[in-house]
Amino acid sequence: VAHGTDSDNTFALSSTGLVLDSRVNITRTGLTTLTLDGLAGDDTFTIGSDHGYATVNVDGGSPSNTDVATITADGLNPVTVTLGTSPVSTTDATVANTGIGTVTLSGVEVANVVAGTQNVTVNGSGEDDDLTYQPTGAEAGTVTKAGLGVVTNLSGVGDLTIDGIGGDDTLTVVGTTAVDAFTVTATSVVHASLQDANTISNVDALSVSGGESADTFGVTAGAIPIFIDGGDAIGAGDAITIAADVNSATFNTGPETDEGSFAIGGAAGLVSFDHVESLTVVGTSVAGNAATVNGNSADNDITLTATGTDDFTVGIDGQTVTFTDFNS
């Protein structure tokens, strides 16, 4: 065990040993587990690969502000981040990789995980996890869990997998203040220029929030409900394009002109939305492409306008839905 002090301490672990506050060099001899105890203060932990320990326990202690751990994987093998339970957990998260072994984090508010262009899996827990992922760069993103004190910043990511593991889990993918273009399914959220959530599994509900600017969402319905929040309307506003393929589409208007939902064919999950100004549903001009439009409890004013062969728009109380390649 390497103890810090009640002041701010800096721990640096690498293949050459452990350095504490740039002055104490501790060399490993026949040990498999190392504990770094920051005690009080705002401590910094830097952990590199090939340090020789199977397990490194990082305890940030009681911070006056923030304890930060930066963990750099070997750049050769995948990385797995497992989030702890909330609100009380002896372990906030673990980070595992062949080159670093298993790093457990307790009392650490910020975990920076550098994957070296390798694939990263972020696992939830067996409880009901409320997860949020925000892409921040071409190979970077941030994952948080409601009720858990650690913010996990990922960089150098190859493919990203987010797995809820167990419980009734939700995932929210958050865009930026700039223009975002998302391709959304029940099992992935792809961003046009930032790090994707390439694989999503064991999640019971998915939300995608565009934030500010005029964002676009290409959506395919699936086994779980998908909610799209366009955010504040800028310019032409936010747009959803629903891929119906060979299926029917039922549109349910909402209480406001920028909200409602779609049921697509036999997909179990509704696609619902709010703060979205442009709505398009695309079929394939087959017999199964039948459109149904449902009003709400108000006195609805519905207008059907043909725009081409198998193409038409339906206006309902100021809200317009464009159906393309729908034959009825």
Where are these regions (language model features)?
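Acidic, glycine-rich low-complexity segments
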Residues: 1-328
